[in-house]
């Protein structure tokens, strides 16, 4: 690997340990989607002084806190990857918090029709047409992937599911701020500070962050800018 890099070439290897121990590599990205492989590779990379970008949300929700601490002790960075729903949601949350707004609920729109009892055998043809593994496709359909991504957001922010499995209402983009809010205000939540998802039209494949504030001037500006009421 080092020789290829020094010659300006692209190196391909079947041994991740070689990548983790390369003297010419500063940052590694894990996009395997396999928690076992991701955890082992990240630990090896961190032990060898590499920064780790974890595009493997399955590994991140399982052992991410440990990897983050291991990276801190080693003086390197462990981080998620921008672009996917958890990171995009975190960007909204961070922006809202920087404005002094209180987070009511944050999450994503589910991309696929929700079918809790979906099994790979039922989706082999569709998976073939979409060039996907049937098992992975079913993870998107049965809600597993959505649950995993919400755990990633919860681990990073301290926001929590309001109920096991979350509510997952069929709220449209325009209805989100009327549904995923506390019951005392006409919504479905028992408290503020939650993660959840919607299967309503106009939300997927996007993310959302519902906020509130007690500050009169901020309330006035949100209403004036037509982003709140």
Predicted features along the sequence, with ranges:
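N-terminal glycine-/serine-/threonine-rich beta1-alpha1-beta2 phosphate-ribose binding loop
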Residues: 1-44, 48
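Conserved active-site and cofactor/substrate-binding residues in soluble primary-metabolism enzymes
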Residues: 14, 23, 37, 62, ...
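Rossmann-fold NAD(P)-binding glycine/threonine-rich loop
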Residues: 32-48, 55-84, 90, 94
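Short glycine/serine/threonine/alanine-rich loop segments
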Residues: 50, 75-76, 101, 159
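Rossmann-like NAD(P)H-binding beta-loop-alpha module
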Residues: 71-72, 79-145
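C-terminal catalytic/substrate-binding lobe primarily of soluble NAD(P)-dependent oxidoreductases
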Residues: 125-229
């Amino acid at each position: 690997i080092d020789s290829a890099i020094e010659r300006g070439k692209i190196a391909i290897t079947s041994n991740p340990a070689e990548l983790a121990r390369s003297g010419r590599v500063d940052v590694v990205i894990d996009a395997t989607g396999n928690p076992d492989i991701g955890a082992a590779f990240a630990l090896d990379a961190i032990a060898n002084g590499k920064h780790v970008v974890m595009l493997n949300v399955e590994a991140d929700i399982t052992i991410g806190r440990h990897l983050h601490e291991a990276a801190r002790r080693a003086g390197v960075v462990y981080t998620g990857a921008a672009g996917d729903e958890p990171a995009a949601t975190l960007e909204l949350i961070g922006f809202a918090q920087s404005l002094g707004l209180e987070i009511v609920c944050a999450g994503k729109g589910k991309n696929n029709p929700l079918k809790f009892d979906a099994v790979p055998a039922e989706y082999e043809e569709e998976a073939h047409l979409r060039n996907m593994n049937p098992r992975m496709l079913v993870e998107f359909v049965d809600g597993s992937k959505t649950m995993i991504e919400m755990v990633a957001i919860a681990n990073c922010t301290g926001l929590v599911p309001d109920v096991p499995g979350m509510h997952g209402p069929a709220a449209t983009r325009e209805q989100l701020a009327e549904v995923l809010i506390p019951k005392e205000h006409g919504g479905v939540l028992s408290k503020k500070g939650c993660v959840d998802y919607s299967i309503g039209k106009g939300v997927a494949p996007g993310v959302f962050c519902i906020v509130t504030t007690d500050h009169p001037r901020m309330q006035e500006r949100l209403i004036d800018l037509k982003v709140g009421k």
